[in-house]
């Protein structure tokens, strides 16, 4: 679990139906999950590692020192888990958090709709009150890996008479529930990480509501903060990820071809400097958010700069690759991972709130403009 991770490959997502790349990948996830180190700073009573801030930092540094891969990539750990810790009932925490830590359940997010993307509060998917449960009807879109997920955390309008940002509830349901139909969306990259998800008379138990009924908007915004941090972190180099210079050396050779170009070398160096600065900033901001001392809009800053940094990374990689960077098929192209991932990064600055929206948030809440 110390081999370099090719972008878009090599991650471990877990879940009921997940097919591991190797026995070593499965063992790594299971061992780390058993210690709670897939979620090191979560409380031990919910399966986490129970580490304090300093211990968590030391663990990350040691993982980086041995060049270890992340044992588990999970919307459960990144998004719904923190929301449950903050707003969930004790029963929901006990039910959902330990399986997330162990990688047994894979989650997806039911937020965006065909007419409600950036204007999330305008969502139309409804949850009709039937006493001890809701009946959900509507459509979600851009639902990442809904066809592979086990559970969904989903926003429903449970009070159609309330004001736009009121009457919304955050609910949880099993993707095997009758009436849930995910349909993959084929992207220009040739991959299908997103789905349309149709809800037709889906029964959602009221004990699966996070927080209070009709008061899910506050939780939704909290979740969006974590989503933007997650998407923004795409611009960072993880412990087992290669830097641009390392990829260039391994794939093309530093002392030959395009890497002899001093302007291209300077571009690679500039990206690595910016990437290191971003990683340090992200660590500082994350610590501030966890301690409650950070500015609420800093997640917008991380999301904006991180996604732009990630797009720059693959633009530079294409320059390094030259004509090899446009090969989609063939033994040496590894399934065309470079052009496919380059195309995929174009969506980074749209998903989770466009770059334009993030800049408006930064201008208003950090710079005090307008």
Regions of interest found by a model, annotated:
Residues 132-133, 137-183:
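A short core secondary-structure module
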Residues 54, 58, 79, 214, ...:
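Glycine-rich phosphate/cofactor-binding loops in nucleotide/flavin-utilizing enzymes
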Residues 125-128:
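A structural signal for short hydrophobic beta-strand segments in well-ordered beta-sheet cores
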Residues 180-280, 348, 364:
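Glycine-rich beta->alpha junctions and the first turn(s) of the following alpha-helix
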Residues 103-111, 155:
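A short, Trp-centered hydrophobic/proline-enriched beta-strand micro-motif
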Residues 72-91, 117:
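N-terminal glycine-rich flavin-associated loop
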Residues 9-16, 253, 258-265, 276-331:
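C-terminal helix-coil-helix/basic helical segment that borders enzyme active sites and/or dimer interfaces
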Residues 1-75, 91-102, 230-232, 246-247, ...:
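Amphipathic, small/basic residue-rich leader segments at the start of a protein or domain
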């Amino acid at each position: 679990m110390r081999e370099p991770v090719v972008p878009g490959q090599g991650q471990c997502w877990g879940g009921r139906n997940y097919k591991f790349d190797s026995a070593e990948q499965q063992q790594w996830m299971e061992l780390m999950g058993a210690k709670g180190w897939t979620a090191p700073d979560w409380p031990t009573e919910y399966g986490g590692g129970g580490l304090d801030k300093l211990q968590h930092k030391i663990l990350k540094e040691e993982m980086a020192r041995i060049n270890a891969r992340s044992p588990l990539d999970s919307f459960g750990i990144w998004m719904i888990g923190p929301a449950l810790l903050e707003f969930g009932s004790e029963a929901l925490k006990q039910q959902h958090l330990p399986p997330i830590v162990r990688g047994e359940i894979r989650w997806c997010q039911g937020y965006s709709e065909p007419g409600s993307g950036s204007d999330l509060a305008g969502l139309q998917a409804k949850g009709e009150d039937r006493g001890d449960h809701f009946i959900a009807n509507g459509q979600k879109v851009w639902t990442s890996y809904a066809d592979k997920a086990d559970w969904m955390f989903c926003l429903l309008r449970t009070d159609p008479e309330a004001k736009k940002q009121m009457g919304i509830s955050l609910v949880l349901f099993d993707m095997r529930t009758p009436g849930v139909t995910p349909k993959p969306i084929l992207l220009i990259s040739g991959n299908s990480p997103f789905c349309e998800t149709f809800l037709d008379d889906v029964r959602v138990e009221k004990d699966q509501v996070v927080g209070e009924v009709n008061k899910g908007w506050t939780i939704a915004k909290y979740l969006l903060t974590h989503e933007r941090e997650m998407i923004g972190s795409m611009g960072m180099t993880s412990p087992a990820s290669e830097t641009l210079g390392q990829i260039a050396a391994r794939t093309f050779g530093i002392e030959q071809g395009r890497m002899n170009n001093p302007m291209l070398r300077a571009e690679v160096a500039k990206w690595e400097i910016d990437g290191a600065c971003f990683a340090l900033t992200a660590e500082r901001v994350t610590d501030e958010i966890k301690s409650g001392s950070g500015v609420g809009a800093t997640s917008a800053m991380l999301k904006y700069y991180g996604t732009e940094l990630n797009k720059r990374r693959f633009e530079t990689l294409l320059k390094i690759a030259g004509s090899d960077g446009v090969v989609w098929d063939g033994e040496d192209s590894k399934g065309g991972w470079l052009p496919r991932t380059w195309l995929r990064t174009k969506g980074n600055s749209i998903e989770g709130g466009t770059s334009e929206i993030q800049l408006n948030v930064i201008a208003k809440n950090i710079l005090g403009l307008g």
